[in-house]
Amino acid sequence: MGKADIVIKGSKDGLTFFLDSQCDFSELAAAIETKLASADFFLVGAHVTVDVGTRQLHPDQIERLQTLFPSYGLILRGINSWADPVGQHDEEERVVLKGNRERIYQIANHLYESTERADGAARNYDYRDESASSFSPVGTAPDYAEATTEPADCFGGSPSDMQTAILTQGGDERTLLIQRTLRSGQTVRYPGHVVILGDVNPGAEVVAGGNIIVMGVFRGVAHAGAMGSDEAVVTAYRLRPTQLRIANHITRPPDEEEEGPEHPEIARIRDGMVTIERYHYGTKSYGKDV
């Protein structure tokens, strides 16, 4: 199957998957799944539109797309087609096919509740459409997927009881807020920034496409700027990582590390190396007084 069968384009509104109208649908679905699996959860929470060109989809094919993307943590917003339902093309009017969102969420939750990682720690995503107050900077924003390593029943109760949320910010940046301590064996992966209100214990791992901010002690594995950004930083009340990586730069602590200072610290790239220094509040340049 040629690479031209699927073209993926990104914009401020999310991702659009353009599918070859002449290619066998089952092959296209398999190719999409391969691409999503290889993304290693970095696309979690992304909004997706599928453009099928002049293809006229059958109901089972529509349902296949509705279940495929949510099963990898993406939000399917619509399926675009130039095909007329009765085969007439006197007016090339785009038809937008939208599935039942509640049904999509039910299927996605079922898939994740029955899935376990190889290390035995369950990874679950909650797709419920709980809207937060427009005046609150933190909330469960509609159409956003939430990632957690806790069992699914931790999402019971009202939105205020939930232990993870999306912080909506200006521009296209998104931040995953985790309000708990990460234990050994737990892994969090997110394409944006990650903020943790708690500690990160040894054996836990945090991978972020942007910055990692921990309001506690970080003793696990950190990888900020995982998509290649040298501008990403890792900051915590105390930085004691077993491994710290920013973009492609990696560092480890000495075998016999001292307890260290009692103040917030920040790790960033300086002169091609990962450096850890004191964080000075209110500065434009981390580690330096204004």
UniProtKB/Swiss-Prot annotation:
For this UniProt record, the keywords arranged alphabetically read as follows: Cell cycle, Cell division, Septation
GO annotations under biological process? cell morphogenesis; division septum assembly; regulation of cell septum assembly
> Quick check: keyword Cell division in the entry?
yes
Q: Does the keyword Cell cycle apply?
A: yes
Tell me the Pfam families matching this sequence: MinC_C (PF03775), MinC_N_1 (PF22642)
Query: What's the superkingdom here?
Result: Bacteria
* Disulfide bond positions: none
Q: What does this protein do?
A: Cell division inhibitor that blocks the formation of polar Z ring septums. Rapidly oscillates between the poles of the cell to destabilize FtsZ filaments that have formed before they mature into polar Z rings. Prevents FtsZ polymerization.
Query: Which family does the record claim for this protein?
Result: Belongs to the MinC family.
Quaternary structure and partners: Interacts with MinD and FtsZ.
What the entry lists under HAMAP family is as follows:
MinC
* Name of protein: Probable septum site-determining protein MinC
Q: What organism does the record attribute this protein to?
A: Heliobacterium modesticaldum (strain ATCC 51547 / Ice1)
Q: Which gene encodes it?
A: minC
